[in-house]
Amino acid sequence: MISFPRILFPVDLSEQCRAAAPFVKALATCFHSDVTLLHVVEVPPAWYGASGEAAFGAWVDMPELVEARRKELAAFRADTLGEVSVQPCIQSGDPAAIIARVARQKQVGLIMMPTHGYGPFRGLLMGSVTAKVLHDAECPVWTATHPADMVVPPEQEWRQILCAIGAEPAKDIPLLHWAAQFASEQRACLRLVHAVPGFDEGQFNCQEDPLRDFVFNVARERIAKLQEQAGTSLNVTVEAGRTGHVVRELAIRQLADLVVIGRGVIQKPLGRLRSNAYAIVRDAPCPVVSV
């Protein structure tokens, strides 16, 4: 059974984090989870040197700053998480590294965070902290790009779930197992989605184009074989286009509550986060769980 006895909710006290809090509260209530509410006092990289944080501490009263943030964190908790079991935690240093470390130390089952807050990276489509956490985290990571615009399902009931696959057995079979088990336990409808790479949406102008038929048939055959190996028999949507766009449009049409994607081990600079995952996380109209 998939469960999340411990959830890590890193917050920078921004409006994005405040908008994500109802999802954390609903999911923690559903799974009876303990929530670690983590705030990292970020030490500017320019102050790191031979003396570490000492240089920064010489200019900033660190205990006073931490105490001020502790009060802000307590107010954030009271305003957003209600009766959920919460353990506040304040640390200083590099946010992404600390989030990954705390997740390992506390053996959390899920990290929940918006894709960016109000920081120096607010102009980017995805904040650097979220990108690093997606890259390094060993547990599933829940993200939402615009949580304020999303509807929290009542009692966190998932009705429609999409699972984006690439039809690569080594990476997708574990992903299929996780998504199928989660959907079954939550009594949700699960649909697979696969984007045909290398083609734009307008490239197939004729529905009977032989190239279109060939490419789509190959994709469907690979997915059928994948499902046979995984022991699943799920409905599949195969469409041409950019992966992020295909997943987004289908999620809108299906009124999806959740998108599940994988972060398979690949020999590329992206490490655990496979290609196209950034686009899905960035563009999805609903929360995304990266496993």
Question: Where in the sequence are the language-model features?
Answer:
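Histidine-anchored nucleotide/phosphate-binding helix
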Residues: 21-28, 175-183
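General small-molecule cofactor/ligand-binding pocket signal
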Residues: 36-38, 87-91, 142, 191-193, ...
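Intrinsically disordered or low-complexity boundary/linker segments at protein termini
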Residues: 1-19, 47, 110-115, 132-177, ...
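Residues at the starts of beta-strands that form the adenosine-phosphate
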Residues: 6, 32-36, 85, 159-160, ...
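Acidic, proline/glycine-rich short linear motifs
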Residues: 39-71, 193-221
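Short, well-ordered secondary-structure micro-motifs
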Residues: 48-49, 124, 153-154, 173-174, ...
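Structural beta-alpha unit
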Residues: 1-2, 42, 71, 75-111, ...
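Glycine-rich, Arg-bearing micro-motifs that act as flexible, cationic patches
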Residues: 110-135, 258-283
